[in-house]
UniProtKB/Swiss-Prot annotation:
Known role: Fluoride-specific ion channel. Important for reducing fluoride concentration in the cell, thus reducing its toxicity.
Lineage: Bacteria, Pseudomonadati, Thermodesulfobacteriota, Desulfovibrionia, Desulfovibrionales
Highest taxon of source: Bacteria
Keyword Transport: yes
Name of protein: Fluoride-specific ion channel FluC
Gene: fluC
Organism per entry: Solidesulfovibrio magneticus (strain ATCC 700980 / DSM 13731 / RS-1)
Primary location class: membrane
Family, per entry: Belongs to the fluoride channel Fluc/FEX (TC 1.A.43) family.
GO molecular function: fluoride channel activity; metal ion binding
C-alpha cells in the first residue's frame, strides 16, 4: 500500500509540473487577457481522463494500480478546476461578465466534448 501511495505522489508531482509548464506555455503564446492556460489544461485533462478511463478501466488495458496512479495522481494534480473557479471569480469581481460567461461556457462545453472524444478513442484501442 505504501508503495502505491508513493507512485501516486510521484505521479501527482509530475502532473503538477506538467500543468505548470503547459499553462505557462499557453499563456506565453496566447496572452493573459483570458484564462487560456487553465482552459487548455482543463480541456486536455478531460480528454486524457476519458481516454485513460475507457482504455484502462473499461477495456482492461491498465491494472487497477496503474489507473490509480494516472487518474488520482497525475490527473488529480494536472487538472485545475479550483484555478478555473478562482479565475472565473476574478472575472466576476472585475465586472467582465461576457468574459465570465465565455469562460464558463467554453471550458464546460469543450471539457465535455474532450471527455467524450477521449472515451471514443479509448474504445478504439
Amino acid at each position: 500500500m505504501l508503495e502505491k501511495l508513493g507512485f501516486i505522489a510521484l505521479a501527482g508531482a509530475a502532473g503538477t509540473l506538467a500543468r505548470y509548464w503547459l499553462s505557462g506555455l499557453v499563456y506565453d503564446v496566447l496572452g493573459r487577457d483570458f484564462p487560456w492556460g487553465t482552459a487548455v489544461v482543463n480541456i486536455l485533462g478531460c480528454f486524457l481522463f476519458g481516454l485513460v478511463w475507457e482504455a484502462g478501466a473499461e477495456r482492461m488495458l491498465l491494472r487497477t494500480e496503474a489507473r490509480a496512479v494516472l487518474l488520482t495522481g497525475f490527473m488529480g494534480a494536472f487538472t485545475t478546476f479550483s484555478t478555473f473557479i478562482f479565475e472565473s471569480g476574478g472575472l466576476l469581481e472585475d465586472h467582465r461578465y461576457l468574459a465570465l460567461l465565455a469562460n464558463l461556457g467554453f471550458q464546460t462545453i469543450l471539457g465535455f466534448a474532450a471527455l467524450f472524444a477521449g472515451l471514443a478513442l479509448g474504445r478504439l484501442i
